[in-house]
Every structure is written in structure tokens, then in C-alpha cells.
Amino acid sequence: MMLTALGLMSGTSLDGVDVALIETDGKQVKAFGPSGYRPYSPVERNLLRQALSEAVHLTRRDARPGILAEAERAVTQAHAEAVAAFVAQNRMRPEDIDIVGFHGQTVLHRPEKRLTVQIGDAPALARAIHIPVMHDFRAADVEAGGQGAPFVPVYHRALAQSLEREGPIVVVNIGGVSNITYIDGNDTLIACDTGPGNALLDDFMYRTMNQAFDTEGKFAALGTADEAWIARALELPFFALPPPKSLDRNDFAALKLGDVPPAVGAATLTAFTAAAIARIIPLLPRRPRSWIVCGGGARNLTMLRMLRERVGSATVEAAEALGWASDAIEAQAFGFLAARGLKGLPLSYPATTGVPMPMTGGVIARP
């Protein structure tokens, strides 16, 4: 049975709430609906940055000490506003939507401690929007010993299977963290985080230029990357680990550029993201023939150029060039995952998160 599923995603980039509608049975996508976006205000973004700092001390996933309780209320309210605006703009009614997939805002991800924390009050959201809400997608995977990320690969596979091209294909999502999904003609599905995405660069731009991000990579294009710094950074043990593996937004926070000109810093961090993505190639079964880039990084032209320089003869293209809605893919994915969760279908696999067996997940909150 086809479901009308609305996905909501607030990623590690802390930019806002993405909203996207799809028609799906949890196995294939029948139709893409409209998408929307509700940006976080500077006050909300600052609150979330504080929540990330405070969350490093958490030992229980349900604890909300100090600023975390306030941040959870803000996240829930922002998502409720995002849904209300989306429904109004598209002249829909709540009853037109069968299920909402609500990721929440990750504030801590420590799979080695079997701990992952996403803030956002799903029962309160369901009451506010009058639609059933599927949430808490990662918990079952982490509790079973999985990495709890990435979760979008099953959706990437559904998208890639609609392309008539020779594999292997890698779909790269460059959000706060970068992750890849490797898809080949043998139906092999491998996924992992590869390293930083936009988070280090965004934080650097905010700190040095008071800008939220480097628009189209124009600032990085003015500088020359410090390749020696990148080589040292790539010596971190994470980069030699085989898939599956996952990261937290703050895992690279200790890397310091030192006192460098802003353009050099931006170029170095952009190149580091590209180099970290390319570093996964020797750890894959076969060398990819094509790379499809989605997420915020797909709009960074310097990032795309730097990735092309590092992947040999393979093609690198933005998802938009294929007719995919790059900014909406992660939100669409959580609508897709909500449909899969409702039907008890797997959300994660041994080769995506390292979980011992294919795992379903998600908890439903009804209005």
C-alpha cells in the first residue's frame, strides 16, 4: 500500500528544518511531492550550539539537563512551524498525510557507548500537527551494537536503482558530516561516514568571517589549501577503518588550523572534506564509476572541483543534474524510513551500520 509520507530533517549543519513529501510503499518511490525549508534563526542556532556543547556530558539518552530542555522545546516548535507552513503553502490538510518521519536534532552520537541522543519531543509534535509521527530511528540500531548511522542508504539505493547506468555508483551526502552509499550491480549496499562535511568549514566561517557558510565555495576558491595539514589530519585512525563507521559532528573539533589567513583556512577545510571522501576509495570493493553529490556541499562549487581532482576518471555530479532534489533528499529519506518502519522493514544493515542483523526501527507517536 502506498503511503503519503512527510519527512523532516534537521542536520548537523544546524541550518534549519527540511521538509519533503513522497508517495512510497517503503520499497520504491512512486512520486516526489513538494519540499520546504524553515531556517533556524540566529538565536535558535546559537541555542543548538550551546546544546551540542552541553550534550558531551550526557550519559543517558533521555536526560535533558540545563539548556538541553530549552533546546528540545525550540526544536519541536521549529518542526511544528515547518509542517504547518508546508501544509498551508501546498493547500493540504493534515489528514492528507499518512505519516511523518521526524529525525530530531542529534546532539550526541557515541555508538561505542551505545548512546545516541536526538532532541525533539515527538508526542508534542504529533499533537501540534495532528499527524502520526515516527521518530527515534537510530536507537534500536545502536542498542543492538550498530553505529546508528548512516540511515539514508536504503533511500539512496531506491533512487540509484531508478538510474540506468553502470555501477558502482556512490551517493555522497555532504551535510555537517559527509557520508557515502556504495551501490553496485550486485545489489551490494555499503555505507559509512567518511569524515567532515560542512561543519568544520561552517564553524570556521562563522568564527572568522561571521558568515554561516562559504557561499558556492567562493571564499575557499581564493585560497590555497595547506596540503601538509590535510595529510596530517588524514593520519587520524578513523580514516583507515573499513566501513561501516560513523562520526559525531564534534569528532574533528580538536583539529586546529592555527593562525592562517581566512581564505587559506577555508580552502584547507574544503579540501580536507574532499580528501576525506576520496580516502574511502581503497576501502571499497571496486573503484566507483560515478559520484553523485547531495546535501549542502553539492552547492559548493569549490568542493565539487576538489572532489573531482581526487577521484580519478570517475564522474562527479550534483544530484540536481539528475533531477533529484538535493536539498530534500535527507528529508525525503526520513519519510521513506517512516514508511519502512511502519511496515517493519529494515532501516539498517550489517554493511551500513555494522548492526549484527538487518534492523527495523522507529517509534510511533499519535496525535
From Swiss-Prot:
ATP binds at residues 11-18. Signal peptide: none annotated. Pfam families: AnmK (PF03702). Pathway: Amino-sugar metabolism; 1,6-anhydro-N-acetylmuramate degradation; Cell wall biogenesis; peptidoglycan recycling. It comes from the Bacteria. GO terms for molecular function: ATP binding; kinase activity; phosphotransferase activity, alcohol group as acceptor. InterPro entries: Anhydro_N_Ac-Mur_kinase, ATPase_NBD. It catalyses: 1,6-anhydro-N-acetyl-beta-muramate + ATP + H2O = N-acetyl-D-muramate 6-phosphate + ADP + H(+). One of its GO terms (biological process) is 1,6-anhydro-N-acetyl-beta-muramic acid catabolic process. Belongs to the anhydro-N-acetylmuramic acid kinase family. Catalyzes the specific phosphorylation of 1,6-anhydro-N-acetylmuramic acid (anhMurNAc) with the simultaneous cleavage of the 1,6-anhydro ring, generating MurNAc-6-P. Is required for the utilization of anhMurNAc either imported from the medium or derived from its own cell wall murein, and thus plays a role in cell wall recycling. This is Anhydro-N-acetylmuramic acid kinase. The gene is anmK.
